[in-house]
Amino acid sequence: MHASRILICDDEPALRELMRIALVGDYEFEEAETVAEAIEVADRFRPDIVLVDLMMPGGSGLDVIRHLAADPALQHAGCVVVSAFAAESDLEEAREAGAAAFVSKPFDPDELSATVASLLVRDR
């Protein structure tokens, strides 16, 4: 069994690092700080989980989620929105686009880890 692949999409390097630290386990990480970079990395890396902020340079995290949902090779990826600025309408739009979960910033490391673990178990 291979290490689960996690793509962390956030324009704040410190937050990306905190997410990596929170996710203790057999994980392989890639990071992206713009929407375009997130899409490029997802296409190459084929992540199992994508942690994505809604507010990113070059568009919205929703663009990343929609890209994953539209690509048969990436549809399996569990998308977790990790965002501080999310109205209920944003969350509904994220769910409709394909997001599986939401974790608010500032995030609780245990909540983030449990959310990722539950999505990985669901998909196995």
Predicted segments — roles?
Residues D63, A86-V103, A114:
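Alpha4 helix (beta4-alpha4-beta5 surface) of REC/receiver domains from two-component response regulators
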Residues A117-R124:
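The C-terminal output helix
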Residues T34-E37, S60-R66:
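Acidic catalytic/metal-coordinating carboxylates
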Residues E31-I49:
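Acidic, metal-coordinating helix/loop segments flanking the phosphotransfer/catalytic sites
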Residues F107-V116:
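C-terminal output helix
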